[in-house]
Amino acid sequence: MNINDPKQVQLCIDESQDCEAPFHQPGSPSGYHHFSSKKLKTCPNMIARILGDNPDIRMTTFESRCPVNTSKIALVVDPKEDYHFLRQDSNMLWSQKAGARPVKNVDAAGHTIWDPQLSYLNYSSEDSTLNYSIFCAYLCVPRIKKLYLLPGGGKA
C-alpha cells in the first residue's frame, strides 16, 4: 500500500477489519472508529475527536488571541474526502501544509491567506478532488506539550 495515496489508505480502512491507518487520525487515541468513506466528515464529529484526543485544546474565534505557548489553527473539511488544518503564523497570516507537500501561505487561488474562513480552498482543479468547502472552527493548541503516539494511534 502507498501510504501517500489517500485513496489507497481509505480503501484499506474501509475493506479490512484489521487494517491500521499508517498515520495518526483524530479520534484514534480517544477511542473513535476509523474514518469511513461511507460517512461524511462533519465539523461536530471532527471537533469531538480533536478535543477527545487533546483536552488542552480550546475553541476560539478569529478575533481572539490564543494564550501564551499556544498556536491558533483553523479546521476545514471536505465532507466526502478529508479534513485540513491551517496555522496562524507570527505575522498574523495563515499557512497550510498538505501531506508531504511544502508549507504554503496561499490558498488554492494563489491568494495570501488572511482568514481561512474566507479563503478559497477548492483544490479540485489541481491533481486532486479535494474541496475544503466547510469551515469548522478556530482552535488554540499547545505548542510545548509533547504527544507520543504508538503504532495505530494510541498514546504512550
Predicted segments, located by residue:
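Cysteine-nucleophile protease catalytic domains, especially the papain-like/related folds used
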Residues: 1-57
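Short, flexible beta-strand-to-coil junctions
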Residues: 76-81, 89, 142-144
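Low-complexity, intrinsically disordered Gly/Pro/Thr-rich segments
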Residues: 110-128
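Noncatalytic regulatory segments and standalone regulatory/sensor domains
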Residues: 122-156
